[in-house]
UniProtKB/Swiss-Prot annotation:
Record keyword Transcription present: no
Function: Component of the ubiquinol-cytochrome c oxidoreductase, a multisubunit transmembrane complex that is part of the mitochondrial electron transport chain which drives oxidative phosphorylation.
Protein name: Cytochrome b-c1 complex subunit 7
Any one GO biological process: mitochondrial respiratory chain complex III assembly
Gene3D superfamilies, alphabetized: Cytochrome b-c1 complex subunit 7
Nucleus keyword on record: no
Family designation: Belongs to the UQCRB/QCR7 family.
Example of a GO MF term: ubiquinol-cytochrome-c reductase activity
Length: 126
């Protein structure tokens, strides 16, 4: 599985190249439209796997308001799933609201995990 750091670097590279950006951006927008998570009230970062130590650390660093908003989005999505209905258009997450609120915390936690692994494997010469 790729780390979020490598995904962010790849995305930055693609966006810095006009030709790649013109090809990839419409495909990405179509993917997001067909994925349908916004119509259930979720943001993209809500879909990331949380069962890793890095993600657990990142989620624990979120501000309280963001944790409450995240939990509310999960409850709303579960209710939509149980009732087999999507949210009305005025309640669905709009593209400008779909921010990457968790990515800075993930990048920080990945950096710390990488540093910890380096320090654990350091060899001291005799």
């Amino acid at each position: 599985m790729a780390s979020i750091t490598s995904i962010v670097k790849t995305a930055d590279y693609i966006l810095s190249r006009p030709v790649l950006s013109k090809v990839v951006s419409p495909v990405a927008k179509a993917f997001v439209a067909y994925a349908g998570y916004r119509e259930m009230g979720l943001k993209f970062n809500d879909l990331l796997i949380e069962e890793t130590p890095v993600m657990q650390k990142a989620i624990s660093r979120l501000p309280d308001e963001e944790i409450y908003a995240r939990n509310y989005r999960f409850i709303t999505a579960h209710q939509c799933s149980l009732s087999h209905q999507l949210l009305p258009a005025n309640q669905a997450v709009k593209p400008e609201e779909d921010t990457h609120y968790l990515v800075p915390y993930i990048l920080e936690a990945e950096k710390e995990a990488f540093e910890r692994a380096e320090l654990d494997n350091i060899e001291v010469p005799n």
